[in-house]
């Protein structure tokens, strides 16, 4: 399905019936990255998942954006569809977006689920910004390969620093603004019940970020998955689904 939000053609999916659950994907991903969660939750809830601007089938913004812009866009998207989420599930940068939007009072869910949420900017930020250099090197080193092979190899190159933080073409400046925006002060404002799910083997967003958010968000609970990647919901779908279902009930 498609809808025009803030002059951007926006692709989304809405399935199931019941209370509304909003899914927010991470940087470089799209709504398909959370499809397993959508399918599971749709048995009990109305699940809404969208491609954020610049990703999937949604048009890219024409100016440089940061988390605030994405937060305002998310509010406008929900208003357009007249939806009031009971819960928000955010993965990686989608988690940082959820934290920021709730702190700005643009979202007002009853419950929040953060899957390997980013948004804590420490010494690793410079490393992540280095993706711009990796992107340039990747382009130069793989231009001669077939397009499908080229894309896979570049993703491996980017994945060396964190696959969720891929530098999408034409969004490099937006990427820079996003990874510079720390949401720890926003997290400290949150009081709603929050489930944190992190992996102890995540190389993109370290487990210490989960512990930090657990301390910052007063009414939060941290669940640690052993041995999973940054895409913990794909590596351990049954475990993650069980945790989310129990938390939202």
Regions found by a protein language model. Name each.
Residues 8, 13-57:
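Conserved HGGG/HGGXW glycine-rich cap/lid loop of the alpha/beta-hydrolase fold
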Residues 49-89, 242:
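Active-site loop/oxyanion-hole signature of alpha/beta-hydrolase fold enzymes
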Residues 1-21, 42-45, 83-84, 110, ...:
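Alpha/beta-hydrolase fold catalytic core
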Residues 125-128, 136-192:
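Conserved alpha/beta-hydrolase catalytic His-Asp/Glu region
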Residues 99-104, 109-143:
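Flexible "cap/lid" loop of the alpha/beta hydrolase fold
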Residues 228-241:
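Catalytic histidine-centered segment of alpha/beta-hydrolase-like enzymes
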Residues 90-94, 98:
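Gly/Ala-rich beta-loop-alpha elbow adjacent to hydrolase catalytic centers
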